[in-house]
Amino acid sequence: MVKQVDFAEVKLSEKFLGAGSGGAVRKATFQNQEIAVKIFDFLEETIKKNAEREITHLSEIDHENVIRVIGRASNGKKDYLLMEYLEEGSLHNYLYGDDKWEYTVEQAVRWALQCAKALAYLHSLDRPIVHRDIKPQNMLLYNQHEDLKICDFGLATDMSNNKTDMQGTLRYMAPEAIKHLKYTAKCDVYSFGIMLWELMTRQLPYSHLENPNSQYAIMKAISSGEKLPMEAVRSDCPEGIKQLMECCMDINPEKRPSMKEIEKFLGEQYESGTDEDFIKPLDEDTVAVVTYHVDSSGSRIMRVDFWRHQLPSIRMTFPIVKREAERLGKTVVREMAKAAADGDREVRRAEKDTERETSRAAHNGERETRRAGQDVGRETVRAVKKIGKKLRF
């Protein structure tokens, strides 16, 4: 249950923070603490129901990526929902505000991962909750824009209600929601996919339409299964993330992944520094294929396969130790360059030398260096380019 507090202890300010489903949100002070307060005006029965639903759901939720409720108050005419105050604003404001801060793919994946964790949690409750309004406006940032929390549960519902009413923000709604079919967790997955596309394009969904502000045009595009333009996605977005977007936005709900699957995939992408498999032609007869894997023990490894026309292929495998990832990348460059000079014999020797270097690295501790993990990919690309100039089999 949400704690009932005395309204006299709540000092509302004039600062307007935004408007959620069913009420305005203002800044306030409660027990010498800055908070956000959602104000519900019960002139309409629908608003009253939304308020009770939001308060009920938030009272059952305890997750680091969901806004925390402090209590509720009433003055007889209106109800007030007291929540933690996150002063850095919404993800929408970050994307489209006046400051226009730049952000990396890694940061976008971090935001998406945190949202996925929260949704996976909501969908896995004993009474699973569907948020029904996933969008950047409902993602609040904190910790110098590094982290986010989902807010505004006014439209949320537990899946046992079998809701068929059209609720949410049109640009982010699933086709089945528009067609008044049953709301399921896969509706949140679709909205998540739309938001992920938005993170990787910094464009409003359906802004490519001839009449992008027409509700009818947007509704028609969604219900017909029209895809958002993938060519608008930033060039450094990993292919795996693009494929995830398309899976989430599949017109068939059954083909969309679960939020738990999405959380797992994004977690692997983020921990690996969004390393991408790639292919590098070295000459007319030789191609280098660099791939990243997780072995049976959960450790990350990098494989470099040299495929040669009418000759046996050669494989080099490198464990990736987090703390020493940067040094490993340099070792890969050095040892592969040696291999390029002498052929197969040196390739095998290089592999042994690199394994020795990695073994030493493993003894130096497990301190996390995410940036170093990215350097492995960059150094590997450089190594392959050097081999393109020097390799002779």
Curated annotation (Swiss-Prot):
Residues in Protein kinase domain copies: 11-266
Source lineage: Eukaryota, Metazoa, Ecdysozoa, Arthropoda, Hexapoda
GO MF term (any one): enzyme binding
SMART domains, per database record: S_TKc (SM00220)
Protein name from the UniProt record: Putative mitogen-activated protein kinase kinase kinase 7-like
Keyword Nucleotide-binding: yes
Top-level EC class as recorded in UniProt: transferase
Coiled-coil zones: none
Catalytic activity: L-seryl-[protein] + ATP = O-phospho-L-seryl-[protein] + ADP + H(+); L-threonyl-[protein] + ATP = O-phospho-L-threonyl-[protein] + ADP + H(+)
Region described as Disordered: spans on this chain: 339-379
Protein family per UniProt: Belongs to the protein kinase superfamily. STE Ser/Thr protein kinase family. MAP kinase kinase kinase subfamily.
Protein source organism: Drosophila melanogaster
UniProt-listed SUPFAM superfamilies: Protein kinase-like (PK-like)
Active site: D133 (proton acceptor)
Cellular component terms (Gene Ontology): cytoplasm
Cofactor needs: Mg(2+)
InterPro entries registered for this protein in UniProt: Kinase-like_dom_sf, Prot_kinase_dom, Protein_kinase_ATP_BS, Ser-Thr/Tyr_kinase_cat_dom, Ser/Thr_kinase_AS
